[in-house]
Amino acid sequence: MSRKNSKKLKVYYLPVTLTQFQKDLSEILISLHAKSFKASIIGEPQADAVNKPSGLPAGPETHPYPTLSQRQLTYIFDSNIRAIANHPSLLVDHYMPRQLLRMEPTESSIAGSHKFQVLNQLINSICFRDREGSPNEVIKCAIIAHSIKELDLLEGLILGKKFRTKRLSGTSLYNEKHKFPNLPTVDSTINKDGTPNSVSSTSSNSNSTSYTGYSKDDYDYSVKRNLKKRKINTDDWLFLATTKHLKHDQYLLANYDIDMIISFDPMLEVELPALQVLRNNANKDIPIIKLLVQNSPDHYLLDSEIKNSSVKSSHLSNNGHVDDSQEYEEIKSSLLYFLQARNAPVNNCEIDYIKLVKCCLEGKDCNNILPVLDLITLDEASKDSSDSGFWQPQLTKLQYSSTELPLWDGPLDIKTYQTELMHRAVIRLRDIQDEYAKGTVPLYEKRLNETQRQNQLDEIKNSVGLTFKKKQEVEKSINDSEKRLKHAMTESTKLQNKINHLLKNRQELENFNKLPSNTISSENHLEEGSALADKLKEYIDKNATLFNKLKELQQANAEKSKLNDELRSKYQIESSKAAESAQTLKILQESMKSLENEVNGPLTKFSTESLKKELERLQNDFQSLKARNKFLKNYITLMNRQYDLKNKNNVQVEKAAANGTRFRSTRSNTPNYT
């Protein structure tokens, strides 16, 4: 949270925490420095004998180094704690290969440091911001680090992102050949109108071409160069520098028109000449975002400044320590507070980084976005440094290993210190690797069981699919059988009706075939013949009746067919007329719609509104003229009534008539004759 603002420089402190890996490395450092730091706090003299704890491989010292004093160990302790708070890789003193930094993935580089995670979110918020609502099209941001090694880690994080980078301190990991355009400068040899200065022209080389009064041909005949100039790059700029370089070069950032500063060094002083030059040249507010680890030694030293206290502590320099008693006491106090508060719970503050970046770029106050950054209040149990458990390292608990760090008891030289630090870090790394290996075994078993369960589930799904497919096939065959049965029943009914009709005809034919035999008497024969003749005549009459009826039906059918043809032709004519009418109606509707659009369109509305306004203006003018006319009439009437002008004119006319002279009542350019 911002606690200190100066003219055009707004400082905001962004709280960060420590990862579990950083906490374990801090506990390893505590195990090495606990005895010496406790002795320095109590004021005990430094021990001379070297008592190595059990577990350290003993060996002859071929290259003896001077023993480190309590003050030196305290400075080393403070420096290493600050390095771990920034990134665990900074604890390593040897050279880091550039190829490794270029190839390291972003996830692995930021996994061990919460500061790097916050920085990654900040630069992503800058890169993927809403450019339409952003006041600046291209953002120029400066990132200030403690050292060159930290700057290498930062550049490895930035590589591959949509930024143009410029390394101001140290050598770049990968030269992307980004060139920052030079700011326009005022040339003293050229006047404002483009003509050369007389003083400078006289002092110029005599071989140079003299000024002819015509403007110089500025046309660039290189097509390739023109095409390059036309390409506008809208990527943002990131400038990488260190605090040391910023202290020694006050014009380091003066020529880049910086919009924002992100400082990894929370002890960066706003009163530095480089920042003062940047403040004086800027015509805008420049926000400075400092990443500060909560409850760290830096937080303890900056607490008075964050709370806007008038008391200012002497801040530490990143390069070398001045042997000052007040500074040394402040270091011990900050480290003691870090030891007391290292196990206190820290709230993870949820910050909207996109909103924070937008607020900073717009020059607004961001205090309401950032949380309050105060030191935690310690209880008496946490402040009690006399307890042995206070100095005991408390590593993150592992499930499959329980390695304890013994406290180093005895003097240390720089070689022994580095060896022991590496030895304990390697032991912790092996424990973590074993924890990972043993922890992945049940995970693999669960993964295998889940795979088998998924395979069984797939088999069940396959069997369900096959069963469902067979069910559909059976249902289809049943439906087909039902349809065939229905069709067969219909055909059977038809055939049964035909059989009944044929049986009836057969019965009639059998009755006709029953003729009388020759043995029958003639009388019987005549009776049978007359009966047969009567029946035949009946059938003939019935056939004739049916034939006449059929003929009538055919004639009626022919008339209906003729009438149907006439109606069909009439229907075709009417339908064609209806189609033409529908087409005409459609055309009329489209034309009507277009006319409505024209009437309701902006052009017609604009002209109508303008005419309405003109009519309203003319009506207002007419009313004003009417009122003015009425006023003048009333005024004339009033004047005539007050001064009796009509009577005076009449008197003058009468006097003139009596005297025999001429009188002109109206004004004229011609002279009056009296």
UniProtKB/Swiss-Prot annotation:
Residues 468-637 form a coiled coil. Its main location: nucleus. The keyword Zinc-finger does not apply. It comes from the Eukaryota. Keywords: Chromatin regulator, Coiled coil, Nucleus, Repressor, Transcription, Transcription regulation. It holds the Pfam family HDA2-3. Residues 197-211 have a biased composition (Low complexity). InterPro entries: HDA1_su2/3_sf, Hda2/3. The keyword Ribonucleoprotein does not apply. Residues 185-211 are annotated as: Disordered. GO terms for molecular function: chromatin binding; DNA binding. One of its GO terms (biological process) is negative regulation of transcription by RNA polymerase II. GO terms for cellular component: cytosol; HDA1 complex; nucleus. Heterodimer with HDA3. Component of the HDA1 histone deacetylase complex composed of at least one HDA1 homodimer and one HDA2/HDA3 heterodimer. Interacts with HDA1 and HDA3. Belongs to the HDA2/3 family. HDA2 subfamily. Required for activity of HDA1 histone deacetylase complex. The HDA1 histone deacetylase complex is responsible for the deacetylation of lysine residues on the N-terminal part of the core histones (H2A, H2B, H3 and H4). Histone deacetylation gives a tag for epigenetic repression and plays an important role in transcriptional regulation, cell cycle progression and developmental events. Present with 1500 molecules/cell in log phase SD medium. This is HDA1 complex subunit 2. The lineage of its organism: Eukaryota, Fungi, Dikarya, Ascomycota, Saccharomycotina.
